Regions:
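Sec-dependent N-terminal signal peptides
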Residues: 4-15
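Surface-exposed, glycine-biased beta-strand/turn segments
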Residues: 19-94, 101-106, 114-121
Length: 121
């Protein structure tokens, strides 16, 4: 009985982890080679994501890693550049797609519309 409670606790925790495990699909159709890793030390900060190499080709198609909705779109001349944030309600996570060369036509239309509305480019 002395070992039963700790064993039961560990078993419950392991089962819980298996039930809550997330399965995401890769955001690209080619082999994922990383050029930057999460937590990597940079000159003045820790890297907060992963950077996927694009086989030297700009404009590769990417896709969402899981079901969700676009919760934020941003365009900046520094930092992430063109970036899309997807919220995944089933998990409570947000995935960030940064350093994009271009948006889809639909998102690009919405971005331009908002820029003209705010007269901010």
């Amino acid at each position: 009985m002395k070992f039963f409670k700790p064993f039961l606790l560990i078993a419950i925790l392991l089962i819980n982890q298996c039930v809550l495990a997330q399965s995401y699909t890769p955001p690209v159709d080619f082999s994922m080679l990383l050029s930057g890793t999460f937590g990597e030390l940079r000159s003045n900060h820790f890297h907060a994501g992963i950077d996927i190499k694009t086989e030297g080709v700009e404009g590769q198609k990417i896709r969402a890693i899981a079901n969700g909705y676009v919760s934020r779109i941003k365009v900046s001349s520094w930092g992430y550049g063109k970036v899309i944030y997807l919220t995944h309600p089933e998990t409570g996570h947000t995935s960030v797609y940064a350093h994009l060369k271009a948006f889809s036509d639909r998102i690009d239309y919405l971005v331009k519309k908002e820029h003209y509305k705010k007269e901010s480019f």
